[in-house]
């Protein structure tokens, strides 16, 4: 199961139900995929296919939606 937290244009922000417990979010689009840690701070964990400007935009979107991502994580995992 991989619940979608939000969408922005071609980007889908989501997480996997059975993955590591450290708070993070995945992003996918037709052009690539990325994973961002949210703890201890928002930082790119890995990516494939995105250019520098897209990664910058994605990082800003994660920061802008950080509370929404945290709330979805807590609802889903019950922590």
Feature locations, PLM:
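A short, structured beta-strand/loop element
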Residues: 16-52
């Amino acid at each position: 199961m991989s619940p979608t937290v939000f969408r922005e244009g071609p980007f889908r922000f989501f997480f996997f139900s059975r993955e590591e417990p450290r708070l993070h979010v995945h992003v996918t689009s037709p052009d690539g995929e990325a994973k961002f840690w949210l703890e201890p701070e928002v930082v790119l964990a890995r990516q494939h296919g995105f250019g520098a400007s897209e990664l910058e935009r994605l990082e800003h979107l994660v920061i802008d939606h950080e509370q929404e991502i945290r709330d979805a994580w807590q609802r889903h995992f019950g922590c």
